[in-house]
Swiss-Prot record:
CDD domains: Anticodon_Ia_Ile_BEm (cd07960), IleRS_core (cd00818). This is Isoleucine--tRNA ligase. The lineage of its organism: Bacteria, Bacillati, Bacillota, Bacilli, Bacillales. It catalyses: tRNA(Ile) + L-isoleucine + ATP = L-isoleucyl-tRNA(Ile) + AMP + diphosphate. A motif ('KMSKS' region) lies at residues 593-597.
Amino acid sequence: MEYKDTLLMPKTDFPMRGNLPNKEPEWQAKWEEEKLYEKIQEKNAGRPTYILHDGPPYANGELHMGHALNKTIKDIIVRYKSMAGFSSPYVPGWDTHGLPIETAIAKKGVKRKEMSIAEFRKLCAEYAMTQVDGQRTGFKRLGINGDWENPYITLLPEYEAEQIKVFGEMAKKGYIYKGKKPVYWSPSSESALAEAEIEYQDKTSASIFVAFKVTDGKGVLDEGTNIVIWTTTPWTIPANMGITVNPDLDYVVIESAGEKYVVAEALLPSLREKLGFEDATVVKTVRGSELDRVVTKHPFYDRDSLVMNGEHATAEAGTGAVHTAPGHGEDDFLIGKKYDLEVLAPLDDRGVFTEEAPGFEGVFYDTANKMVTEKLEEVGALLKMEFITHSYPHDWRTKKPVIFRATAQWFASIDAFRDDLLAAVKGVNWTPAWGETRLFNMVRDRGDWVISRQRAWGVPLPIFYAENGEAIITDETINHISELFREHGSNVWFERDVKDLLPAGFTHPGSPNGEFTKETDIMDVWFDSGSSHQAVLNARPELSRPADLYMEGSDQYRGWFNSSLTTAVAITGEAPYRNVLSHGFALDGEGRKMSKSLGNTLLPGKVIKQLGADIVRLWVASVDYQADVRVSDEILKQVSEVYRKIRNTMRFLLGNINDFHPTTNAVSYENLREVDKYMMIKLNDLVKNVKDSYEAFEFSAIYHQINNFCTVELSQFYMDFAKDVVYIEAADSHDRRAMQTVFYEAVVTLTKLLAPILPHTTEEVWNSLIGEGVESIHLQDLPEVKVLADSEEITAKWDAFMQIRDNVQKALEFARNEKLIGKSMLAKVTLYVDGEAKTLFDSLEGDFAQLFIVSDFELVEGLENAPESAFKSNQVAVQITVAEGETCERCRVVKKDVGVNPKHPTLCGRCADIVVKHYEA
């Protein structure tokens, strides 16, 4: 007889290697074929809903790790909710209008000016849809489960129709107006930009101090006195209309080299050295309020510059006197309006000076900086020039600097409902908590929202103009345009004449001849995505507004979170979301931003081809995503190692229950041994902790909880000593079936708990566990937390035992290093105990030699009896010696009773009994 044939060795079809790049697409094809997404919705029909609303990624370019991070977090949440008693449909979306697509089309050699706007827009739409298709394939390969056949796309007619309604509703409430005021203007995009489209980068600029000569001192200043201003935008001097001083600051008139100058008193010490005023004497001190309406002369144009009082002039930097160009700054515009100054912005859309700036016509504004400073020097007005590096606004698409430029634009008034917006922010649950403060301050401090764009690819502003110039936005026109867009798409605006866009028989008192024109500007793309609560949540029967969760990157506080809040509060009076969760950015292994120029980009598509989607997903679960996260080949290697541990744990569990049938072989909890109960309690604790972590969106906690359970509780303890039972004992022995019961519960529980994170691997485990033709793991519910008898008492006892076991393991390790023993199975452990430890061992049930994975064990009372050579800790002393007896050929345990059965001279008594009873014919 071959004794190895009497061992019950593990058997499973679950392979050690995942081969994920090849296996995952097979599972995905199966899910698609079986309509798994639809089945999940059917299973959960009638349950409470949990709606995570997808913030639409921009349909341009290859997916990056930020996309993978974002979509995987969403997918984990939706999968969790779908297994936790909720109906949680997921409708993915795309943002498809805007400049990057126009630019991409231009790069293909398309000449926009050589075709009609409608033709150009068709090319943009085609390009956007190919990008959507490419990204959709990438997201599906990542294992994202959703309604991929019916996503929402901002260029679709039904979406645009609802967006028009949002605009119409805001206009009806008086929130939409046209005005000329300074807005962020991007010469590189030739369009106005909203605050959300601005990013700050360092820029080197000329910093200049300029003298304006007083022509009318109003009895406070002598004629010819110089008021000194400071600016870092010399190109705005041609548009200067005034100087602002703070009414509550003290200003000094100083005399230096026969000239008088005015600066803020608080800044004089720093200016003495900077402007060469070391020897200057103070002639008089005046209050800023006394300088109100003093008149100075523009340095090189024949016009006045009026001195005004404004709070934005401070003594923090410069001179305390602020150069004011109402056409090129928000504060300047507001103070200019108060003092009735002209709003001069002598630049065209490309940032080139017009004839309104004599001497600089046809010059790009940035190039004009040098010309302006030379002109100031020529007329003797330039006191000082130096260069500084400062944070400056840039166009987030083109990465080029932007300017403030007054133009006629359409705005959404924020003041009209700012208090409602702030109240709505307070009513939302924010994770991380600082998100509330961030958005609250943003809403509190923001100006009106410029919603018009001077571009072609976007949703047209549905505005008509009468013959007298009056803008027409009525219920009748809005509803008509909305339905036209629903039927034909927004291109109809550019394809048809005005008369064919207006409702039949439309009249207006401002057009006695029945003539009308239409607006040519389009809407800000943030108005597009910001209308999704209306176009998607409100419009789709399976969804609802407000959503339970918006979850995006932390850049969306100024973007989608903000624009969605604005439009939703404007038309419904409440936020479109109950909870907002934000994540950080994906950086490289050294914490640097990924960029092609640095050569440090890691693309999810490439990682999936090499390692599999489940590795990318496990990486997402491993990081603290609420801050910026790091990813590199090395980090993914570490994650792959954890994946391997989890997979091997599953394989061991599956292999050792191949002859176990839960309906017939399971041992009830009350009939388990205490150590088995301990594992069931630990497993139950894991269920509670993991579910709590899912509920709190703390996926890295789950990663550590499950990894620790697989490594510490299972691999290093329970599965380790189990081999002496499940391989060796008779197939139906109580102890073996008890351990198999725990194994079965563990594999079922772990598979369900991991399903939202590792959908492909858990499906493979489930298939191996339950067999072919089984319902997907993703149609199961998560395990319930059970109430297990005596759990606190059992846990306390066995946790204490595990601490002592750690000491025994250390002693065995020491003995191995000292060459006292080879394998631990050759050892005998003698444990010297006192007090609590003695009481503990008296109360424990178990085969301690088996639990310590040694051949013999002896418990001795009295620490004082331990020999000097014993390994001592605070509670116990451990003596390691070589076990007496022979090694059993079958179980490899050293036993004194090897050969007790003469028919089986190489077997111990236990193994001989098993062989005789179960394997001898």
